[in-house]
Design a protein with these regions (language model features):
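A broad detector of the eukaryotic-type serine/threonine protein kinase catalytic domain
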Residues: 22-23, 58, 95, 118
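Conserved protein kinase catalytic core
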Residues: 18-20, 25, 61, 135, ...
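Asp-based, Mg2+/Mn2+-dependent phosphohydrolase catalytic module
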Residues: 2-4, 66-89, 97-126, 130-177
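Acidic active-site catalytic centers that drive phospho-/nucleotidyl reactions
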Residues: 12-14, 55, 129, 133
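Substrate-recognition element of Asp-dependent hydrolases with the DxDx(T/V) motif
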Residues: 36, 40-73, 85-98, 137
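Active-site loop/turn elements of alpha/beta-hydrolase fold enzymes
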Residues: 20, 55-56, 149
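Active-site neighborhood of HAD-like aspartate-dependent phosphohydrolases
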Residues: 1-51
Length: 177
């Protein structure tokens, strides 16, 4: 029997789920953004898979390592677990702009997530605070949604400029599959 495919919402990590503090390697620095729990709860209630897609060039530049990235992700998991929530997949690019296929806006990590999970792009979206997030959405044929981050947005015109992650998720759910 073929598994039922779930639509995915691809989420940037820094500036979208948590405060962007530069090259965060200390789990104690994790601060969930204000509407994250409500947004993830709404996605779960509507059976969307949540997949984090993140550029972590601090690894290539020596400011971070895989252990630190995993420890920050684990702290996010711990905090969400306290609210009965989970992230379905964590993917990050450890490279610095070296032509790889996994650094956003390249679609390599989205394609990997699609292979590793029973996901569909029908009804899917990409949410992030940078132009590379919106461009990634475009490259895989899904809406790219911009949420405010610590830096002015520079990039292609998003399908939606949302004031919060929750507003972005409400738009996705209203659009349906």
């Amino acid at each position: 029997m073929t598994p039922r495919l779930r639509p995915a919402v691809f989420l940037d990590r820094d500036g979208t789920l948590i405060e962007d503090k530069g090259f965060l390697g200390d789990p104690a620095g994790v601060e969930l953004l204000p509407t994250v729990v409500d947004a993830l709860r709404l996605l779960a209630a509507n059976d969307y898979a949540t997949i984090v897609i993140s550029n972590q060039s601090g690894i290539a530049s020596g400011l971070l390592d895989e252990v630190k990235v995993r420890s920050v992700n684990a702290e996010i998991v711990r905090r969400l677990d306290g609210d009965g929530l989970a992230i379905d997949g964590w993917y990050w690019c450890p490279h610095y702009d070296d032509g790889c296929d996994c650094r956003k806006p390249e679609p390599g990590l989205v394609h990997r997530a699609l292979r590793e999970h029973a996901l569909t792009l029908t009804g899917a979206a990409m949410i992030g605070d940078r132009g590379s997030d919106v461009e990634l959405g475009r490259r895989v044929g899904i809406p790219g949604i911009a949420v405010p981050g610590p830096f002015p947005y520079v990039g292609p015109e998003p399908d939606l400029r949302a004031a919060t992650l929750l507003e972005a998720v409400e738009w996705i759910v209203r659009r349906g599959r």
